[in-house]
Amino acid sequence: RSKNVDPKRIAEYQKVSGQALKEWRGYTLTNKCRWSIVSIPTAAWAKKIFPDISEKEAMDKLWELIFKCSRVTEDPIQAWKEHNNNLKEKTDFLNSKKFKTLKYKSKITDLTVEMPEGHIWESGSEKDVNGIEFNPNMPTEEIFCLPHKFGVNGTLASTKPLVYGGNIINDFILKFEKGRIVDFSAKEGEETLRHLIETDEGSHYLGEIALVPYSSPISDTNT
């Protein structure tokens, strides 16, 4: 995590890096090559989670958590096959139902999301241009889809912190009208959130929605 970094600098970095990495993203986002994002522990990260033990012990414990979340077991290949099959069952169910609207609701969240015609739910594994299956995100628990750009209405409250450009955004609330964020607040990192939302007009809209289980190897770590 970066400390005391001007949110304007973070926003500018994200914008410039997006332009500089455009060709690379063209390959990965269209699956012209197989790729994966993985988590690698650092000493600072480990001590942030486990401040009361030595740096080495903290690193070891963080590696253990990452291995658990990433299903690095005695037979990780089989574990990932079973996990991908389980996620695919969920996406097959949703794709067969073709729900027109989703409703997210909690004590604060009250959000209605319209789904576009012909929408397709996806999950953990993908296939490259040669038809070879791979997992771009490890670990992953989500099934996800594209919402209707102008069909998101209501209030959305975060349940976990968001780390953006090394800065933490916590306890934030977004209000949507006709797909667009029209108001927002955050108890921590509100200025960073502002720059994220105001990157351009497109960043005022949701590009993806996801469903994740309440209990999972990631969630159960409670870190």
Segments the model singles out, each with a brief description of its role:
Residues 1, 42, 109, 118-120, ...:
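Short, glycine-/Ser/Thr-/acidic-enriched flexible segments
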